[in-house]
Amino acid sequence: MNQDHLIVDLERLTVRAPDGLLPDVLVGTGIVDGYVRRSSVLGDLLVAFGSKGVTAVELAGDPSGFVTTYEQRFGKRVVPVDRVPAAIARHLDTAIVAGRPGRLPVDLDRLTEFQAAVLRAAATIPRGEVRPYGWVAKEIGRPGAVRAVGSALASNPVPVIIPCHRVVRSDGTFGDYSLGDPSNKRRLLVSEGLDVAAFESRAAHGVRFTGSDTTGIFCHPTCRHARRTGAGHLVEFASEQDARAAGYRPCKVCRPVAA
């Protein structure tokens, strides 16, 4: 029995099923994927999921457009549902607020191994911090693949939950964002406590790393350790090479690299 026959048979049940039962049954059997609406800093989101976890996140606009795009991208129907599987429901709202999956199951099976590795690395960037594309490339063992990293982040199917908004260009500019225009990237980072204006000012003046003259350690400027350094002890560097030449060693937490 194919999925269309099953849908017809379910619709022909002589006893009226509770509203929402048909979509929930279809999603539960894996015949189609489901989606729900959730709130976020950027407004309402449409969050899709399948049997293995969350598959897509988009800004809530025209649901029919979301459905069409989803089916084109994933080759599977997606329908609105009333109920979310417990394994997802338990952690979904927390993941959206935290900007990282945590214990929320996320299905990256439709991605290439490289794309999935890029997203897993991005998911480790702490809330309110940013890293350059080069950092992600080195984290996954592909230091020469900076441009490919950017492409993988641009096609991130689950933005907000996997925080591609925390990855910036090598010159410190924020760049594009897969979930709407670049201003959404700034809005998310501001909501996480990042002083966006200060970060952009440093970047515009060529500052890529900062160090503490008391510890002799240099960091990415948004690293939580760097932000604890008082202004009187803060040293700015244009490159990793400059920091090392001055006798500074890299932070073991943010692992600064030349982008």
Task: Name what the model sees in each region.
Residues L153, S178, A258:
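DNA major-groove recognition helix of helix-turn-helix
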Residues M1-P143, S191-A259:
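Basic nucleic-acid-binding alpha-helical/helix-turn surface characteristic of O6-alkylguanine DNA
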Residues T173-G193:
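Phospho-regulated, low-complexity intrinsically disordered regions of nuclear gene-regulatory
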Residues V160-V168:
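Short Lys/Arg-enriched helix C-cap and helix-to-coil transition segments
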Residues A145-P159:
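Regulatory, non-catalytic segments
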Residues A122, C164-H165, L188:
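Structural signal for hydrophobic
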